[in-house]
């Protein structure tokens, strides 16, 4: 009986002190870096504002994925048509933006903030003012950052959106 106890203790001791390198090893998990950095997302949004105010539809639409959606319903073709109309009817556009959040995900980024667009209409002394919340979902396609989805709303006020600015 005494020998069994000694053998049992010896076997347990061997298992506990057995060199760790002989045990089964699991490779360490390496997390993939995000496909978009916060700085890249910020630069992209700055480029978006710049191209919007230059009103060149070709340059501007390069920022959108061909599968892009606007306000949960407009397709790429609809988006292009909408912005083309806006650019065609504008003498100039001013775009103010305050980014509140940039969230980085494995597959992209979400950028949220508030915008204010002042649209000087062609052949009119009036300017339209639009403002509200905005959100972009960004992805990387073929190595290029693009808009997957853009959603925005408008703050409605009791006064008219047409303002005679000097």
Where are these regions (language model features)?
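A short gly/proline-enriched turn/hairpin at secondary-structure junctions
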Residues: 63-76
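Short beta-strand edge/turn micro-motifs at domain boundaries
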Residues: 25-30, 34, 110, 129-166
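Bacterial N-terminal signal peptides
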Residues: 9-18
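Surface-exposed, charged secondary-structure patches
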Residues: 84-126
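Short, low-complexity N-terminal intrinsically disordered segments enriched in polar/charged residues
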Residues: 22-57, 62, 66
């Amino acid at each position: 009986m005494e020998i069994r106890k000694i053998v049992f203790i010896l076997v347990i001791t061997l298992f506990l002190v057995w060199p760790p390198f002989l045990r089964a090893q699991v490779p360490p998990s390496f997390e993939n870096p995000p496909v978009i950095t916060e700085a890249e997302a910020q630069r992209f949004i700055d480029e978006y504002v710049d191209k919007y105010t230059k009103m060149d539809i070709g340059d501007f639409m390069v920022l959108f994925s061909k599968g892009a959606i606007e306000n949960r319903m407009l397709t790429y073709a609809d988006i292009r048509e909408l912005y083309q109309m806006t650019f065609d009817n504008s003498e100039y556009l001013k775009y103010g933006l305050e980014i509140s959040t940039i969230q980085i995900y494995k597959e992209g980024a979400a950028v949220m903030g508030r915008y204010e667009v002042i649209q000087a209409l062609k052949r009119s002394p009036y300017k339209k003012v639009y403002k509200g919340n905005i959100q972009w979902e960004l992805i990387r396609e073929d190595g290029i950052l693009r808009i997957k989805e853009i959603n925005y709303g408008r703050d409605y006020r009791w006064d008219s959106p047409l303002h005679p600015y000097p």
